[in-house]
């Protein structure tokens, strides 16, 4: 059983600054970290490894220079995967969901898999598209919002999803792609033994050419900016007469 768990390196949000001039975001001082939602996918994959016979967990990521960081690689491997594959290329630095999914699908095909796990979204864009797009590209079943994995056999995965008024149980034929919600588990903090052992695990570094990927992105990101802050008008209306009520209503109309 070959399980791939996908993750994304994202900027640490506490270190992101906003440029006052145009509202653009400054990532220059933000260290990269594993997307919070993908930690649940990594944990779920490693829990499945304990259930499946001869299961192997491969962590897979696509991106730019952030994936060259040795500390980041060790962080991923210390959480339980047996090996790590990173696909690094400058064109993937700010890849949008469609391109990310295409690269992940190509890399997964080269690596081989029975099951692909990922988080419902990423901590930066949270587009909630990549998992389903990977399934579409590979032409295999894809399910998102999975809150519990009930069982795994050689050819079937049984899962639960929490819907608005009910709990849905699904049996999914393998191979498949599953995007898990944060309700599925609580990611463990790696032990010192796991951190030290991570340095001994294999890491494969692939380029776009290595996976036969040469498609250009269908669209590109133009700008990411923080919302403009409006100054408070500090209008105070005193009294409860008809004129004051009318003035209050008029000011409300201006801001609604």
Curated annotation (Swiss-Prot):
Involved pathway(s): Amine and polyamine metabolism; carnitine metabolism
Which Gene3D superfamilies does the annotation name? HUPs
The answer to keyword Transport applying to this record is: yes
Among CDD domains, the record links this protein to: ETF_beta
Q: Which GO terms describe its molecular function?
A: electron transfer activity
Q: What SMART domains does UniProt report for this protein, alphabetically?
A: ETF (SM00893)
Q: Name one GO biological process term.
A: carnitine metabolic process
Answer whether the UniProt record assigns the keyword Transcription regulation to this protein: no
Q: Which family does it belong to?
A: Belongs to the ETF beta-subunit/FixA family.
What the protein does comes down to: Required for anaerobic carnitine reduction. May bring reductant to CaiA.
NCBIfam families given in the database record: PRK03359.1
- Quaternary state and partners of this protein? Heterodimer of FixA and FixB.
Which named protein is this? Protein FixA
Q: What is the lineage of its organism?
A: Bacteria, Pseudomonadati, Pseudomonadota, Gammaproteobacteria, Enterobacterales
């Amino acid at each position: 059983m070959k399980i791939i768990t996908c993750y994304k390196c994202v900027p640490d949000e506490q270190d992101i600054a906003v440029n006052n001039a145009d509202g653009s975001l400054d990532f220059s001082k933000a260290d990269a970290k594993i997307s919070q939602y993908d930690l649940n996918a990594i944990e779920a994959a490693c829990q499945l490894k304990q259930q499946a016979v001869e299961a192997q967990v491969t962590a897979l990521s696509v991106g730019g220079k952030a994936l060259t960081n040795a500390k980041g690689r060790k962080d991923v491997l210390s959480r339980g995967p047996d090996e790590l594959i990173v696909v690094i290329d400058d064109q993937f630095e700010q890849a949008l969901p469609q391109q990310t999914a295409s690269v992940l699908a190509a890399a997964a095909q080269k690596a081989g898999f029975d099951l692909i796990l990922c988080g419902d979204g990423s901590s930066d864009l949270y587009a909630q598209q990549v998992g389903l797009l990977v399934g579409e590209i590979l032409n295999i079943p894809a399910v998102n919002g999975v809150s519990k994995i009930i069982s795994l056999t050689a050819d079937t995965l049984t899962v639960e999803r929490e819907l608005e008024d009910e709990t849905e149980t699904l049996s999914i034929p393998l191979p498949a792609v599953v995007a898990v919600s944060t309700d599925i588990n609580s990611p463990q903090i790696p032990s010192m033994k796991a951190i030290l052992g991570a340095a001994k695990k294999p890491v494969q570094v692939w380029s776009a050419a290595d996976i036969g990927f040469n498609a250009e992105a269908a669209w590109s990101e133009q700008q990411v900016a923080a919302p403009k802050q409006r100054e408070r008008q500090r209008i105070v209306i005193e009294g409860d007469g008809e004129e004051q009520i009318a003035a209050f209503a008029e000011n409300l109309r201006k801001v609604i």
